[in-house]
Curated annotation (Swiss-Prot):
Keyword Nucleus: no
InterPro entries the record matches: WD40/YVTN_repeat-like_dom_sf
Residues making up the signal peptide according to the UniProt record: 1-18
Protein name: Ommochrome-binding protein
Alphabetized SUPFAM superfamilies for the sequence: Calcium-dependent phosphotriesterase
Glycosylation, residue list: N183
Tissue: Present in larval hemolymph and synthesized by the fat body.
Subunit structure: Monomer.
Record function comment: Binds to an ommochrome, ommatin D which is a yellow chromophore. May be involved in guiding the chromophore through the hemolymph from the epidermis to the gut.
Keyword vocabulary terms for this entry: Glycoprotein, Signal
Amino acid sequence: MKLLILTICALHVNQMMALKDCVVVNGKNYGKEVLKDNIHQAYQLSFDPQQNTLFFSYSDEVDSKTVLKMGYLNLATKSFGEISGVKDGMATAVDTTNHIVYLGGKDGIYTYDYATKSAKNIGVTSLSIWQMFYCPIHGLFFTTSDEKPYVFKDGQVNQIVEASSSKTRVMAVGEHHDVFFANSSGIFLFNHHTNKVIDLGDYNVNAFTKDSKGKLYFSSPVGFYAVNEADRKMNKLISETGEDSIWGAAFDKDDNIVYSNEDNIVKLVPKDKC
């Protein structure tokens, strides 16, 4: 009888785990595949489809102190490593057209070398980089630790005057070339046709990303959202809380959602049923 009860309890626990590890996105079922565990607070995720490699920053303990490091994860081989050469690395972005991986550190912009698994400061700015977003047309957008917006293009770094009146923690460019930015007050849109800033709502945005078609998304601690630029609405695709709170997100080469939580990097893979 005791064995039967234990068996039933085990089945119940397994069922609960299966439910927890399955999510429904736009009416489709997805399972959670852990790509990397024991990786603390992976942040600022970006993906290089040519090399099937994910880039991010993460927190680590060194001599009882918390430090920021940059890392890479090959999604095919699950090979993980620390990127050397970046001072207090925080931000990542990928130029898929020219095959350049950009990394942001405390003292400027770096590029990644696959051969040496290291990064080199390209010497265009000494600003402390917080976040990056690459746009094929307009260049490398980035924000600084004091929440100011900039763009790097054609060898020049310029402050984005249109968005500089408000603090900018993270930013991105939409399908229609409008600039989206977020701070502690929420998410905003700078419409380049009207030169007006539009309040899109009180969302705690920690990262922007886009899929292979250029559609814009963002993550927050409580979920992952699609940005509907036509009606300026935010469509919540994933809800998470507690230890599963989302730190950042990206898309792989097949447009599967990859995101990080407190201690893992997870990919959503199609599943028949939850």
